[in-house]
Amino acid sequence: MRISENSNRFCQHFKKGWGSIMDQGKLTRILKSMEEHEVPQMIVSDPVAIFYLTGKWIFPGERLLALYLNVNGNHKMMINKLFPQESDLGVDIIYYDDIEDGVEILSKYVEKDKTMGIDKTWPSKFLIRLQELGGGSKFVNGSPIIDYIRMVKDEKEQDLMRKSSKINDIAMDKIIPWVAKGLTEKELNAKMREIYKELGCEDVSFDPITAYGHGAADPHHVTDDSKGNVETV
């Protein structure tokens, strides 16, 4: 039997444990790093990185989502009108619809005579369009800046990781008795999620892998309806 988990990231976040406005401490660290790397402006499109800064999950699908950061403080967020934001994200939001050229609108706010950082997830169709519009004197990979800042945890993040790890240990203790109750892998998976919710987690960071038998030896096993052959001695 195997229950796959990672104690430092399994419990996504705690109820009321994460804000929904731009984290100024993280933003300051990013802007300082941008200055050090001579990248005065940058486009962040990765929903995970945007959540890291704003505490808000936005999944745009194929549509443009771009957080524009500038060391001069002229920050903008490009969001399609299909994803209206009810809460304050701490940044000016510019909405566009499907009949508008979102990149062209974005290009009106950038500094075209300066280097532009682009993160590693921004689709090429948007990058090429920005290049056509002359949206920067040159384009560089800006992801190492944010990736490094995310790696170095601040005190609040370290505290959350400790709490998450402690909750995870408790969850593992609670799920073990259920292994011998004849549940399918999917049913055990659902029970695992239920336990995390009872312990105060809003959600899991990734889908738990619950596996019996040979599936337990598969590092990427897909949880199914099989049952384990478990005997209590």
What are these regions (language model features)?
Residues 9-21:
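Short, Lys/Arg-enriched N-terminal segments with co-localized hydrophobic residues
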Residues 21-108:
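N-terminal accessory/capping or targeting/presequence segment of soluble
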Residues 24-28, 101-204, 215:
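Flexible, acidic/His-enriched mid-domain "rim/lid" segments that flank
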Residues 35-36, 59-60, 69, 108-110, ...:
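Solvent-exposed alpha-helices and their adjacent loops that cap or buttress functional pockets
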Residues 40, 114, 231:
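Conserved acidic residues
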